Amino acid sequence: MAPKKKEVTRIAKLNLIGGQAKPGPALASVGINMAEFTKSFNDKTKDQNGKVIPVIITAYKDKSFDYVIKTTPVTFLLKDIAKIKSGAKDPKKQTVATISKEQALEIARYKLIDMTAYDEEAALRMIAGSAKQMGIVIEGVSAYKEKKGN
């Protein structure tokens, strides 16, 4: 006979700072042992200290938990590479930074495991779309797929 499955009480999606998670209201609402979670999370993310790390926490009725660490959001990576604090207020009229195609490809390769893109080219277009919405230009890359023919 298969072992009984634990009863899930909550699934929470949080953005925490790598290596610096602390017990607080966001974690308290999940209903887990906060000290145990923060110690484990900080140990696993100490190499990403200071970066925003999305985490999905599954809390069970017996107060145990599982969690999955995701990759840093594209917007944070773009701001970090472009060395800006925020995107453009009106990205259609304003450009706040320009990054190289190689820098964008680096982000695409890093994010590929969490994206729905099938290859680097599709991931690069997704990164370009996010960059465009922030007022960041990627040299030599369009957010749109070029049509063949015509």
UniProtKB/Swiss-Prot annotation:
Disulfide bonds: none annotated. GO terms for biological process: translation. Forms part of the ribosomal stalk which helps the ribosome interact with GTP-bound translation factors. One or more lysine residues are methylated. One of its GO terms (molecular function) is large ribosomal subunit rRNA binding. Part of the ribosomal stalk of the 50S ribosomal subunit. Interacts with L10 and the large rRNA to form the base of the stalk. L10 forms an elongated spine to which L12 dimers bind in a sequential fashion forming a multimeric L10(L12)X complex. GO terms for cellular component: cytosolic large ribosomal subunit. It comes from Ureaplasma parvum serovar 3 (strain ATCC 700970). It comes from the Bacteria. Belongs to the universal ribosomal protein uL11 family. The keyword RNA-binding applies. InterPro entries: Ribosomal_uL11, Ribosomal_uL11_bac-typ, Ribosomal_uL11_C, Ribosomal_uL11_C_sf, Ribosomal_uL11_CS, Ribosomal_uL11_N, Ribosomal_uL11_N_sf. Keywords: Methylation, Ribonucleoprotein, Ribosomal protein, RNA-binding, rRNA-binding. This is Large ribosomal subunit protein uL11.
